[in-house]
Amino acid sequence: EYNDNVNKVETFFKKPVYKNKYEWYIGGKIDGINDDNVLIEVKNRMNRLFYRLRDYEKVQIFSYLYILELENARLVECYKKQNNCNINVIEVGFDQDYWDNEIMSKVVLFASMFENFMENRDKRVELADILLGTNPA
């Protein structure tokens, strides 16, 4: 049982994560932070509670923790069925190794590949041809 006083936050937060030719940022709007500086993220489920942290939610929560320099989060999943509301809380702690190896490494790879793509006219034309169906290949 939790007796959190959750402070709703309306601010869009962002933080630079990589710089090459351009500066790359991650950002987002969080649901709230409790009085103990624990990030609160609420997910309203459509069919059922998952009782585990989904990969895409982990990336989202880790990004928020990184941006805000927080260590802990709670994912609150809610499933409403008729007049009942089932709630499950999943505790999430920031893991620097996971952040570096599973998230940031992919952000850096994407950013560098995108910058290379944008500087390569032939690659841009090739993609346009594919998307427009004008590529004979």
Regions found by a protein language model. Give the residues of each.
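Accessory terminal regions of nucleic-acid processing enzymes
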Residues: E1-A137
